[in-house]
Amino acid sequence: MTAFVPVSLPSTSALNDAYVKSQLTKWDLLRNLRCVAVRYTKYYHKLQGQELLADLFRDEKVQEAFQVLRKGGAWGQLGGPVTKVDATLLASSLTRMDLFDKLTETSPPIVRSNGDIGKCMEDNREGFQVSDQLRELILVEESEHAALFSEAERDELLWRLFEHVVLGGACCQFEDKVEPYVETSKRLYKELVCAQKDPATGKVQTVSAVYKINSIQGDSGPLELYPSRSRQNFCYAAVDPVRRIVKILYHAYVPYW
């Protein structure tokens, strides 16, 4: 029988880091962000990720620890027995930050050599203000830089986290320079993804499996994960098979109006 035990995040966690918390507060992400760490005892093969997630979210202790934001603004449990978890395995193999080099190497650059983010004509897409070329890259399909990053690159967990911090919450205070976005994305990524050196090759490689939780089913249908629809709603479950820890990173977007 599997035992799941919620544990506290250590003081060294990125979510307890003063810099990260300050940036997430500035971008209006911290107030509706939660991270739950859970130890598990049963061995799961890497192909049994869906089984692990189903067992995880069915566990009573996990259901007590993992809470979601309701429409009224209160936090609460999922509200029913879990019958199925629909999740997508994400790419999380990156061990370097050179993915972001393209932002300065393209012509014209999205990010200038001094780190400044280029500005653009103001627009509004999906409820988000677009006033710089970084947000335009993320939100505007017809942007001249839309093809700069491939679909596979945009599916990488590191890029997903980067998008989340760039877009922020409803009261986000934008950055003029790219560095805070990149640095915070890196720290969150390292929080979720465990890396080890391969003894055979000497190369550093990731060992974690990270899943995007699409929906959680109950007896009578989907259980409500978020108070409203938004691309800034996310729930990631990062499985560290070495230490047998799952970290669930959850955020719910609440519109200002």
UniProtKB/Swiss-Prot annotation:
Disulfide bridge partners, by residue number: none
Subcellular location(s) of the protein: Cytoplasm; Cytoplasm, Cytoskeleton, Flagellum axoneme
Main location: cytoplasm
Keyword terms of this UniProt record: Cell projection, Cilium, Cytoplasm, Cytoskeleton, Flagellum
GO cellular component: cytoplasm; cytoskeleton; motile cilium
Alphabetical list of InterPro entries matching this protein: CFAP300
Known function: Cilium- and flagellum-specific protein that plays a role in axonemal structure organization and motility. Plays a role in outer and inner dynein arm assembly.
Protein family (similarity comment): Belongs to the CFAP300 family.
Official protein name in the record: Cilia- and flagella-associated protein 300
Organism name: Chlamydomonas reinhardtii
